[in-house]
Amino acid sequence: MKPGCAAGSPGNEWIFFSTDEITTRYRNTMSNGGLQRSVILSALILLRAVTGFSGDGRAIWSKNPNFTPVNESQLFLYDTFPKNFFWGIGTGALQVEGSWKKDGKGPSIWDHFIHTHLKNVSSTNGSSDSYIFLEKDLSALDFIGVSFYQFSISWPRLFPDGIVTVANAKGLQYYSTLLDALVLRNIEPIVTLYHWDLPLALQEKYGGWKNDTIIDIFNDYATYCFQMFGDRVKYWITIHNPYLVAWHGYGTGMHAPGEKGNLAAVYTVGHNLIKAHSKVWHNYNTHFRPHQKGWLSITLGSHWIEPNRSENTMDIFKCQQSMVSVLGWFANPIHGDGDYPEGMRKKLFSVLPIFSEAEKHEMRGTADFFAFSFGPNNFKPLNTMAKMGQNVSLNLREALNWIKLEYNNPRILIAENGWFTDSRVKTEDTTAIYMMKNFLSQVLQAIRLDEIRVFGYTAWSLLDGFEWQDAYTIRRGLFYVDFNSKQKERKPKSSAHYYKQIIRENGFSLKESTPDVQGQFPCDFSWGVTESVLKPESVASSPQFSDPHLYVWNATGNRLLHRVEGVRLKTRPAQCTDFVNIKKQLEMLARMKVTHYRFALDWASVLPTGNLSAVNRQALRYYRCVVSEGLKLGISAMVTLYYPTHAHLGLPEPLLHADGWLNPSTAEAFQAYAGLCFQELGDLVKLWITINEPNRLSDIYNRSGNDTYGAAHNLLVAHALAWRLYDRQFRPSQRGAVSLSLHADWAEPANPYADSHWRAAERFLQFEIAWFAEPLFKTGDYPAAMREYIASKHRRGLSSSALPRLTEAERRLLKGTVDFCALNHFTTRFVMHEQLAGSRYDSDRDIQFLQDITRLSSPTRLAVIPWGVRKLLRWVRRNYGDMDIYITASGIDDQALEDDRLRKYYLGKYLQEVLKAYLIDKVRIKGYYAFKLAEEKSKPRFGFFTSDFKAKSSIQFYNKVISSRGFPFENSSSRCSQTQENTECTVCLFLVQKKPLIFLGCCFFSTLVLLLSIAIFQRQKRRKFWKAKNLQHIPLKKGKRVVS
């Protein structure tokens, strides 16, 4: 099967839900663009937990305004089912009994239909032969530990011609033995009287269910069963899924008796089925309930449907009509008002029979509980469904809520639920596990959150068997049966183990993660943020201080600058403030309050020719400014030399045209480039990453596995050459550290009950991480497990790939060329084994991925599984020793432009697991770099800032974690002892941040002082002037002389 790929995550996210073609075909055809989309969408809708009134079902399509994308209980609820919850499993007689004409059994309409309509199927004798191997069925029931077993009685096995006269003794003995064995095991029997195997004689004589004579005959048959088995049976089902009996048996012709084209016959059959059920219920209620104390119902099946637009009333109306025409057709007369739904009566008045008032009264309330079937038979074939242009969905929880609102919150038994796998799947039915998990999760949420009264659940089915129109091309059993074997051994599938665990625990226990801890990271912990490639500004943004020429504007009236020749002005030296882009970077970093900033250089910009013949000094000056200006804010840089995000990004064009990383000379060119960067920036940079995610870059060279492995080899050599160069020439003076960062998602077996999946998960880690880690951290050579696995496929003719053979010199070159371990971790992958042929890297691994739709995930399908990062850190320590580890990129995409709650949830949970690794597991974790600073337009939203630099609320959350150094106890101090240098840097930080304001303030203050000084000076001068002038006008007294 060809995998599908969803791009947009830090690594391509492969999405798998199934391993067989039939499942994939149904998934892809359902729901106008894919059932998978509907399943994932429906898992994100929380239903309103309201007490409904009859007929209020359409309210279910209104979305809850209180829904939050990070409330995990709204996606998957870790909780238990109510005490004494009824756990069961079911089968149908025709599907598993076999022996279709043995011991006096009469033929059924399906026995005839198989011979006349189904190609390549001769009979049901190839089924599980439960009629012969009853003890093996009982052992299977014991293995799972169910509370009840739902099975059907074969009407023609008891009465070969359908008429209740003398019962077939062998048939009677078989069912009596089965019931006795169940009672002995404390397993409650739930017995279905009619599961589609009408005696052929009744079809030929009366026309089957089209003739209302069958009603009385069915009642006689039911009466006999009540008499013979009622002392041991407390739960009865009259008819299993009458909709399919009528619609496919008499409408599409897909089921026996194979009639089609007569719509009036379809609704006549449905009418008679309802009346037959009602008659049997009244019979039991009057004559048997008083002393047998049992309950009786009819199993009704349905699909579920979602509106194209939840806000569109017409789409909601169509969804309501779709449900009414299938489930309401039978539920409304029995569980509702005794009549068909009003919409059906108006639309189908010419073909829909009419209930008299007395019949309505008789129909109403003829079920002691609501028995509900929700499985693949209700969803296929799609062209026969009443979709009404809307989207089919597998949301069982919504269907249960609809029943609650339409029929006044009845007690509900899930009488059939499950999915199917391809007939080639044997015991490793991984898809079935996840479908069961999804369905059971929805039932649990319906009980706990929506207060729906579900009291039991029937997994379908116990055994592989005959699957109606699909015959033996699909399997639905929890136990695998080889139909061609003589002994028909029942082998438990993975789904049987899973269901057994669910029953034992009575629900879902949270085993994967431990409780949150309180504690702090060390004071020297690196709190960082990651950015991808920073494109340098080619020219300074502010050239006015560096251009020595004088210009005159509009000298000729053309509104242009004209240079004045012969005049040169004095310029100032170049400054980092010349680059406007850097200022924006610094503003964002200052708001992040991180201690470290990881960014990548653009190799192609620094060395356009790929060698040292043409060095772009302007680009180097730009990068030096980024680092130096960051240091002024107290933010250190972790610089990545090469950060490709696709095949050619960042690789100089001449190297790209020379086959890129397939050419060994590229490694030498990288060494020269690295040496230049160490020389120009190394005095300021203490943490270096040579290559970002070489284990993903090499995947791009995928014409063959040998291309992939060759590119990886050259990438390893390039890193080692750069590390050796730094160690030899620059480390003594610069005292930095160099490593490379690996994409390092964790892997879990998709099927924990399959050894092959456990091996596949470890193989994923070997091919993904150990592929590069083993040569550098440990042996100098590729992992032995990886080499042997590829060689074994080569020997079997499945692949022509081979890992390169390293020389002794190359092993010495590679070994130990890391100063720390740098990991980019985003999610956990669920891995399954699938043997693949072909000589490519993906095929060599024999791995496929499965997405668990019950888990919280991002828009790009990145699953939020926090405990995976802790497992990864422990795995690295266990395999490569106690070394310093930096998580150099970790994050999630979140569609929110402001309140990015998913990102806050992700950060909090993942940092909790990292803290556990530090405090409990003693992993030497040295830093965490959140991915990423700013998002890019038209790409998944991983950024703390939008593409137009608007801050999101996750910044404040990350700030708080950083300032607290984790998750401290109450009243504990988060302060670290600071040196004088740190204090001074704090002052520097304030000055740099407020530099424009301070400058403006100084100018304003100086101007104000100058104006005040002038004003005071002028005032004093005026006072002196007027004083002198006034003295001149003072008169002398007569007779007085002034004697000197």
From Swiss-Prot:
Keyword annotations of the record: Cell membrane, Glycoprotein, Membrane, Repeat, Transmembrane, Transmembrane helix
Assembly behavior: Interacts with FGFR1 and FGFR4. Interacts with FGF19; this interaction is direct. Interacts (via C-terminus) with FGF21; this interaction is direct.
Residue ranges of the TM segments: 997-1017
Localization of this protein: Cell membrane
InterPro entries in alphabetical order: Glyco_hydro_1 (IPR001360), Glycoside_hydrolase_SF (IPR017853)
Cytoplasmic side: 1018-1044
Primary site of residence: membrane
Membrane is among the record's keywords: yes
Job description of the protein: Contributes to the transcriptional repression of cholesterol 7-alpha-hydroxylase (CYP7A1), the rate-limiting enzyme in bile acid synthesis. Probably inactive as a glycosidase. Increases the ability of FGFR1 and FGFR4 to bind FGF21.
Tree of life domain: Eukaryota
Record comment regarding domains: Contains 2 glycosyl hydrolase 1 regions. However, the first region lacks the essential Glu active site residue at position 241, and the second one lacks the essential Glu active site residue at position 889. These domains are therefore predicted to be inactive.
Protein name as it appears in the record: Beta-klotho
GO cellular component: plasma membrane
Membrane topology reported for the UniProt record: Single-pass type III membrane protein
Gene name of this polypeptide: KLB
